[in-house]
Amino acid sequence: MARKIPLNRIRNIGIAAHIDAGKTTTTERILFYTGVSHKVGEVHDGAATMDWMEQEKERGITITSAATTCFWKDYQVNIIDTPGHVDFTIEVERSMRVLDGAVAVFCSVGGVQPQSETVWRQANKYGVPRMVFVNKMDRIGANFYNVESQISDRLKARPVPVVIPVGAEDTFKGVIDLLQMKALIWNDETMGAKYDIEEIPADLVEKANEYREKMIEAAAEQDEALMEKYLNGEELTTEEIKRGLKIGCHAMAIIPMLCGSSFKNKGVQTLLDAVIDYLPAPTEVADIHGVDAKDETKEISVQSSDEGEFAGLAFKIMTDPFVGQLTFVRVYRGSLESGSYVYNSTKGKKERVGRLLKMHANKREDIKEIYAGEICAFVGLKETLTGDTLCSEKEPVILERMEFPEPVISIAVEPKTKADQEKMGIALNKLAEEDPSFRVNSDEETGQTIISGMGELHLEIIVDRMKREFKVEAEVGQPQVAFRETVRKAVNKECKYAKQSGGRGQYGHVFIKLEPQEAGKGYEFVNDISGGVIPKEYIPAVDKGIKEAMQSGVLAGYPVVDFKVTLYDGSYHDVDSSEMAFKIAGSMAFKDAAREASPVLLEPIMKVEVEVPEDYMGDVIGDLNRRRGQINSMGDRSGIKVINAFVPLAEMFGYSTDLRSATQGRGTYTMEFSHYGEVPGNISKEIIEKRKG
């Protein structure tokens, strides 16, 4: 079966936005106008087809990225819905990996909000070309031009409007298309399905001319031939302007900018046209890099084409009540039929693909074969996890691995009834497979099950999903912070482990130097043994001993981070030495050295941004100071005060409730992990005493 739509007519896009900028509504409208969903779903009443998990319906925020396919003017658009909440940035990063372009949705009133900055940085990191849709133009306080200047000031990007609004707030009627120089006015009877093309209103002609000139200049700058023509005073054709804007958009030099009101069904078609005109096809983005699975030092670049052996990346795992486990895969090269085998090069295992499903919001369609540039769900994979590469055994390649952040918050969970113990274990493991930023382990001392994640909301949703999807009700303990330990000075230490009591003895003797590393460097082991004073085969055992010992530090038993150990001397015994003996010697030497190396306790410090009306500013700052916060900056954002601070996570529990009562529900905040910082002496002492209990 040959492919129906050529590769250059495919667009893989993500729609990324801050909460409440209207992202899900925008996606919904796209599905409506491209003929997928017949009744327009509203987030307000929880019926949107994209938000298909129950909790999302209740909370009205999008949690998991579902991939949906729709068609517009002979083009296939695959939309990956990305969550807009800070606790889910992992989901956003993951979808950024497999996108070719993104539409950033901003609210015309709120503009660029903290989460939008985070998402923007992630899109920069993965080199995703993007365009902007300014939504909610019908709201009170809507201002398209404000958002334009915020994008250049805050995001340091260059927005180029290709349409400008006609009216704003309740007089918002449509847009002026700066390419055709016509006004597109939507009529409300057809639910926005049709618009009338009219002459530009007299009071907007001057503004339209000014913005058209800016747009043409931006387009001309992207290409030498166009620049020459422009400087010679010749008119650029519509096609030439589009070409210039497309080149600039792909190079991330400019950001095409549009506006509308998804809720009021205005401006969505022009957005779809722009997606096709400016965002790249899979063939127009840089080749993805990978390494040879047989020899990881050898780089391979994988070109988007149907030719060549199959290669794809698993970017999302979901459990579907009817089909079982779905593995969402982006195909980069080649094609694959359902029922065939794929090779998971990350794990080194072969798996059979039972079915291939194309997802349309919440409906699914079985397909026989999938081609390069496509995104679809594989059914039947048992071993594959997020970030694994699937390819053909003939040409095994490992595509770039995704990096996942370490969790910063943990809570103990136990099932309400003993009978649910096993069910809870199964449920948590399934959820951990879906979400790499969520971990499950059991506390050896207390035997409790501990779950860890990226924030309170993240863990709340996990507990909620256990109840809904797996029917397990859980009791939740107090949140615990992921403390760490580190050392502040360098120490040399000798340790001899010798046991001589009948039978074979044990003998391991090491000299190590323990020294601090800069924050975030992690653990480094240096082998500086010369002349064979310790045989080669025992050296990894010393490293292993240190790795085991660093899991539980000398102060309060927290993992030790950011240090370097150099093994520089030692001795061995022909008969009694063994790997075991050197492992024990390594771990004892490390523990002894750590006690003398000025150990300190570290805690996660969060970057917190609070938005409050001016009247409450003093109270909120006072409260942040009481929470050991360090205020970094204060500013204004469209009439609201914005406070940026670093605050220890340990002090932030229950903050949302406190902020609500302090500001009568008018304050909002976001927080994300920033770095680990040293715990002050008096507090550190309390924590250590409590741990040793």
UniProtKB/Swiss-Prot annotation:
It comes from Wolinella succinogenes (strain ATCC 29543 / DSM 1740 / CCUG 13145 / JCM 31913 / LMG 7466 / NCTC 11488 / FDC 602W) (Vibrio succinogenes). The keyword Protein biosynthesis applies. Residues 8-283 form the tr-type G domain. One of its GO terms (biological process) is ribosome disassembly. SUPFAM superfamilies: EF-G C-terminal domain-like, P-loop containing nucleoside triphosphate hydrolases, Ribosomal protein S5 domain 2-like, Translation proteins. Keywords: Cytoplasm, Elongation factor, GTP-binding, Nucleotide-binding, Protein biosynthesis. Catalyzes the GTP-dependent ribosomal translocation step during translation elongation. During this step, the ribosome changes from the pre-translocational (PRE) to the post-translocational (POST) state as the newly formed A-site-bound peptidyl-tRNA and P-site-bound deacylated tRNA move to the P and E sites, respectively. Catalyzes the coordinated movement of the two tRNA molecules, the mRNA and conformational changes in the ribosome. It is found in: Cytoplasm. Belongs to the TRAFAC class translation factor GTPase superfamily. Classic translation factor GTPase family. EF-G/EF-2 subfamily. GO terms for cellular component: cytoplasm. It comes from the Bacteria. Its main location: cytoplasm. GTP binds at residues 17-24, 81-85, 135-138. This is Elongation factor G. The lineage of its organism: Bacteria, Pseudomonadati, Campylobacterota, Epsilonproteobacteria, Campylobacterales. GO terms for molecular function: GTP binding; GTPase activity; translation elongation factor activity.
